[in-house]
Amino acid sequence: MGELYRRLKAYSETDEYPYHMPGHKRQVCGELPQEIMNIDITEIDGFDNLHAPEEILLRLQEEAARLYGAEESFYLVNGSTCGVLAAISAAVPKGGRLLMTRGGHKSAYHAAYLRNLTISYLYPEMMQEYDIYDAITPEQIAEALAKEPVPDAVFLVSPTYEGRIADIEKIAQIVHSKGIPLIVDEAHGAHLGLAEGLAKNSCQCGADLVIHSVHKTLPALTQSALLHVNGNRIDRDRLRRFLHIYQSSSPSYVLMAGIDNALQVVKEQGGYLFAKFQINYLRMLTKLSECRNLSFLPLDARQDIGKLIIVSVKAGLSGQQIYDILLKKYHLQLEMAAPGYCLAMFTIGDGEEAYRRMTDALLAIDRDITAGKWQSRQKQDGREEEEISLYQLHPEVRMSIAQAWDAEKEEIPLSQAVGRIAGDFVNLYPPGIPVLVPGEQIEETHCRQLAEYLKEDLNVQGVTKDAGYRITVVKNE
């Protein structure tokens, strides 16, 4: 149990009456549990202030920094989104240049919009056998930085949504040789570096700014995250200023207690929990090697443990079909589905039953595929079109993100959008990585493939299904 939760619980048992916010006054309101109300307070005496920490919150952030090997750490209650916005805003001047992976989260693009940045993209290589993208390599970074003009900062995602880990140590050396900072969105790697058998985290590898979603892979509440800073390439006062802007002025003590509790669990039980987690996961992978149709991304030196990538390409099925079968027949809710695979996440929060159910279900599905029970939706519909990943395309940039997003726009049929300028982000969600960014020219391949994704029931944001498929574009003059 974390120190902040203990203090909140003890306070709730006193006779002090709250003549202050929040409005529920620690009383039962509707059907929410009383326990939540009891510890949901504001910045009252004795509980510090996240925006000017001096006591318990300062101490907890210092403990987080020691745990991750950072010089300074900040609690975030607005998720990693807040951390990414603050990191990019602090590292890159308004109107500056950012070199970033095309696979960046939409919050990175939002930062570029807000700060009117010019973006240069790094395009990850496709792992063809598994239909997923690898992490950005040091060679790609070196090649990009050899060109002029040199950006003001580099922004990477590691691990990727699918668990691919970049060689941050080498990349940091290359980036720093140019005198610029490295920002790593490590939202999916809050567990890294915390136990034997896990890869190092990016703080330990020399990154200047690192963002962790504590809730993604550790036992914390949704929306809780951390931002770490190292070295002298980042103005700390400037970083704090942007955190004040992007972070709520009424930070949730429930969420902060959750961060503290999760990190306390790691400190007290992490060795045992992570060892058990790795044993269970590897045992599951061994059993799943019996599958003849489904395949799984193997654990190599650059693959994060816990991300089970269920590849359905060889079976002739879409990732969405496997996702739907697991949900509807076996009541197993996965993280996401993509055209050629789906993703199940495992953490120290999973017991042996979670591994058994997933193993049994996938082995049964694999047997059903062999027996011809499942057929691809394309074959069912009489469609046999070759699919291309839209992330492989390098759309022509016709306007900056800020220009396009602020321009007058209109909604038109997707089939009529070829050659037009995208007026909004279009992405598969999750994870929210854009296939089209405002200001980019829409190609015929975009229109055709987006329509295919929608027919496969993939969650495409930025294209509506009202009165046929429609997309937002910049209005012609």
What are the residue ranges of the model-derived segments?
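Conserved C-terminal alpha-helix-loop-beta "cap" of PLP-dependent enzymes
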Residues: 286-441, 448-462
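Short, compositionally biased
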Residues: 116, 121, 455-466
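Structural signal for conserved beta-strand scaffold positions within catalytic alpha/beta enzyme cores
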Residues: 75, 121-123, 212, 336, ...
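Short glycine-rich or small-residue beta-strand-to-loop segments that form or flank ligand, phosphate
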Residues: 47, 74-76, 154-157, 309, ...
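Conserved PLP-enzyme active-site core in the AAT-like
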Residues: 4-11, 31-33, 70, 80-297
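Conserved N-terminal alpha-helix of the aminotransferase class I/II PLP-enzyme fold
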Residues: 37-79
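N-terminal glycine-rich, Lys/His-bearing helix-loop that initiates the first secondary-structure elements
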Residues: 1-36, 427, 431, 463-464, ...
